């Protein structure tokens, strides 16, 4: 009789422990799987995103224009968060450009909303006189989307 009681108590303890483990781990596994799914969506979007700088040129020492095409299969959102840079090809001069009209080195575009597949967008670059482009020098224009896909174009002023 004692063995039956001990066995019953051990079975009850085992079932209770298993229930506690399942109750504790289920939410953790659910959160983890959601994180993996979200991460996979981000990676898929990045894989489908691609751009190409079609042309970049300077009209004078303080003004340049660049055209960038969305050649990927995904629309690009939040274009205002893109990163644009001009640097000397040898790396001795680096000019980061900021979106907007209130900074010295800036870029603007007329594009609003999503940048769709196959669309080419024009970017107007304004450079402060202290960072002005030098005649006869070769420059590298770099463009990076908000999710890190980048393209570059070499031009001479």
Language-model features, listed with the residues they occupy:
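N-terminal export/assembly leader peptides and their processing motifs that target proteins to secretory
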Residues: 27-157
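C-terminal juxtamembrane segment of a hydrophobic transmembrane alpha-helix
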Residues: 8-40
